[in-house]
């Protein structure tokens, strides 16, 4: 096991682009002993180990089997909501097993200590596992064709060259359908360059069966001179021109955040639970707001359910790069440790998260989750009275729950932000490094510049960053005062009038969605708001409590629907989808997006068009944005934030933030 952990750490550090802090912060100690406190708690290290042992002592797995997943099989939602402290906690694990080229699923009853179900899944591929990743890389770098390709470019195989297996995507012309393949580009890492992607070896790519280690093909195409080593990629990455005086967040005493049990979080009127998940990263559950002593439901569960990052370069060594990172690698599996004072305030609460590995054990990522409160520097509300020459107001404070997966060259800061006003923000900050390719063009006056930049931008001399998209799909099981909810659309319509001297104004038309499906854009109105509403309860004014879904980043995929990458990622074609709650519909692109040839996710979930009015429904939100690359992304991408807001409407009787005292002394007027 110790040897495996060392191998895992080496894999993680390499995939995270040689970030030494990742290695240093990876726990090598025995997994923590954790007691289960709630039915939605993540599997403990002991439970993961027990599940693997039960599978291996049954016919479901053997000593050679690898596990693409060993995760909590959640109880039915109705059972979770009916559970009370002190009641028994049923525990089941769901496992994905890979052995001798075959995939199967299993359900393990941990309470009864037995395997209760095994299902073969022919043609399906689990996410890329580290043992396969390492086998593929080593096989390619030992291949004579690889060595010869380097020599053609004046390079020698050795420690200054490294290669990183990527998920292969799906292109029909690939002759390796059914095999567990990865595609492998290579880079140079001499002169202690930081992530080394600054010097890609263009035209060289391996295709390897990661399961068998067979090198199926070596693409040795065009030869492009390596770009010069750019400044700013070394360990001395930042050299400020002038020192910046420290700006810090201070918290009186122990602050207002309370964390208990297994990541139960309480802050002001908010309560929720968080759990680690190898695929989703972090899942937020049982979100409630205490309204004058009454805990009210807002969300049963929220998490990232898939990503889609297609690059816009037709070159064969780039066209396959249409990554679906959650299902192909796992946001939790590649979560990075957080640094106090950089990733989170020094006053934050830092927590370690434990994940299952591929052989039935666990590893712990230290400081993988942080929870903190912060002043925004903005007023929560204010008003200036001209007659009294007096300002009244309160400063705004918010709670942030944060984790940061590092997916190859990109780091994604994923936040769930809660305010005293009852709003929830979903925020993602993209940073890290643009993926780049070498080019002969030094600047835009170079003879080849126009042709070379047809699918990207020159961001430094001899370096192009291809254009690409980012799509994050959130699964939002929102509960507005319970589970019987309806999705509404409030459209703003211009309305002519004939009195009062005006010609027109706008009015609101409300539409009910009656069936599952994508929520298409309404081009006839002056805008719209989606609203999840409970038609069976009312506020003091007899209005039905609702949650508005305010989307701010709404790019949708414009790829051809018959384009093979798009065929696997149908969720990206619409900003919102709505489906009836089903316990097995958890992932936007289906359970097995790795090497998939069709979409088994949202389009399939809603194909039967079930009725959704006054039902327990799930809203799926696609946070999409196009990345037109630019020199300002270089040498490192400044964090680019994207967000959507879940805002209460007709939910409270008044502004709920009026009841909280921020505890800040304001100067006398």
What are these regions (language model features)?
Residues 27-42:
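N-terminal low-complexity, Pro/Thr/Ser-rich intrinsically disordered segments
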Residues 61-111, 157-209, 268, 401:
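Exposed beta-strand-loop-beta-strand "reactive/processing" segments of non-cytosolic proteins
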């Amino acid at each position: 096991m110790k040897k495996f952990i060392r191998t895992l750490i080496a894999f993680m550090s390499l995939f995270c682009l040689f970030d030494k802090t990742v290695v240093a912060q990876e726990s090598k100690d025995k997994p923590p002993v954790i007691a289960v406190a709630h039915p939605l708690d993540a599997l403990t290290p002991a439970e993961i180990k027990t599940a693997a042992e039960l599978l291996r002592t049954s016919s479901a797995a053997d000593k050679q089997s690898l596990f693409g997943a060993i995760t909590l099989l959640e109880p039915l939602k109705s059972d979770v909501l009916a559970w009370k402290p002190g009641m028994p906690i049923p525990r089941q694990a769901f496992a994905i097993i890979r052995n001798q080229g075959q995939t199967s699923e299993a359900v393990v009853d941990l309470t009864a200590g037995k395997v209760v179900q095994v299902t073969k899944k022919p043609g399906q591929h689990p996410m890329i596992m580290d043992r396969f990743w390492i086998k593929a890389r080593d096989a390619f770098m030992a291949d004579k064709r690889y060595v010869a390709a380097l020599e053609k470019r004046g390079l020698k195989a050795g420690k200054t060259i490294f290669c990183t297996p990527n998920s292969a995507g799906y292109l029909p012309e690939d002759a390796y359908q059914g095999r567990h393949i990865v595609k492998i580009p290579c880079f140079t890492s001499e002169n202690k360059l930081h992530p080394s992607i600054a010097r890609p070896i263009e035209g060289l790519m391996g295709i390897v069966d990661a399961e068998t280690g067979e090198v199926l093909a070596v693409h040795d195409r065009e030869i492009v001179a390596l770009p010069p080593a750019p400044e700013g990629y070394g360990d001395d990455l930042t050299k400020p021109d002038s020192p910046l005086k420290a700006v810090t967040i201070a918290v009186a005493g122990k602050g207002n955040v309370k964390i208990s049990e297994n990541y139960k979080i309480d802050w002001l009127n908010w309560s929720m639970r968080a759990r680690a998940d190898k695929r989703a990263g972090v899942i937020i559950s049982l979100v409630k707001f205490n309204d004058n002593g009454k805990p009210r439901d807002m969300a049963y569960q929220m998490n990232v359910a898939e990503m889609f990052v297609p690059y816009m370069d037709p070159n064969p060594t780039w066209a396959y790069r249409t990554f679906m990172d959650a299902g192909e690698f796992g946001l939790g599996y590649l979560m990075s440790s957080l640094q106090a004072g950089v990733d989170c305030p020094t006053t934050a609460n830092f927590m370690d998260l434990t994940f299952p590995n591929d052989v039935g054990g666990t590893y712990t990522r230290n400081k993988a989750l942080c929870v903190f409160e912060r002043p925004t520097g903005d007023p929560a509300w204010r008003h200036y009275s001209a007659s009294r020459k007096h300002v009244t107001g309160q400063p705004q404070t918010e709670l942030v729950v944060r984790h940061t997966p590092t997916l190859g060259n990109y780091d994604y800061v994923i936040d769930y932000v809660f305010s005293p006003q009852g709003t929830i923000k979903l925020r993602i900050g993209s940073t890290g490094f643009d993926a780049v390719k070498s080019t002969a063009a030094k600047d835009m006056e170079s003879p080849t510049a126009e042709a070379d930049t047809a699918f990207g931008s020159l961001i430094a001399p001899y370096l192009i960053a291809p254009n690409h998209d980012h799509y994050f799909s959130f699964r939002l099981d929102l509960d507005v005062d319970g589970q019987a909810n309806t999705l509404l659309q409030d459209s703003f319509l211009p309305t002519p009038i004939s009195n009062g001297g005006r010609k027109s104004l706008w009015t609101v038309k409300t539409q009910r969605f009656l069936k599952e499906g994508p929520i298409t854009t309404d081009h006839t109105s002056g805008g719209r708001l989606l609203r999840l509403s409970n038609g069976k309860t009312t506020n003091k004014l007899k209005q039905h409590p609702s949650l508005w879904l305010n989307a701010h980043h709404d790019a949708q995929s414009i790829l051809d629907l018959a384009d093979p990458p798009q065929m696997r990622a149908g969720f990206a074609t619409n900003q919102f989808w709505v489906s009836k709650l089903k316990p097995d519909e958890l992932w936007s692109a289906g359970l097995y997006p790795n090497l998939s040839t069709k979409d088994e996710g949202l389009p399939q979930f809603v194909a039967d068009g079930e009725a959704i009015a006054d039902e327990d429904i799930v809203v799926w939100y696609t946070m999409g944005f196009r990345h037109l690359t630019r020199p300002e992304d270089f040498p490192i991408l400044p964090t680019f934030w994207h967000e959507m807001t879940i805002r209460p409407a007709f939910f409270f009787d008044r502004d709920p933030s009026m009841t909280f005292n921020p505890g800040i002394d304001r100067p006398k007027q």
